[in-house]
């Protein structure tokens, strides 16, 4: 679960997560994808690049 907004600037980022994940999964360069999605601030880019999906890993322990 990616946060809805960037922690630093507050820009809404969650709506672009699925497209980012799909395009990078197809082998496209993450920097190019973020440029196309209009994420130019490094704080927002960090949210995408540093995010790790742990929901599926932690779900069995609930």
From Swiss-Prot:
Cofactor annotation: Zn(2+)
First-level EC class: transferase
Signal peptide span: none
Summary of the function given for this chain in its UniProt record: DNA-dependent RNA polymerase (RNAP) catalyzes the transcription of DNA into RNA using the four ribonucleoside triphosphates as substrates.
Family per similarity comment: Belongs to the archaeal Rpo10/eukaryotic RPB10 RNA polymerase subunit family.
Subunit structure: Part of the RNA polymerase complex.
Stated name of the protein: DNA-directed RNA polymerase subunit Rpo10
Organism the protein comes from: Methanococcoides burtonii (strain DSM 6242 / NBRC 107633 / OCM 468 / ACE-M)
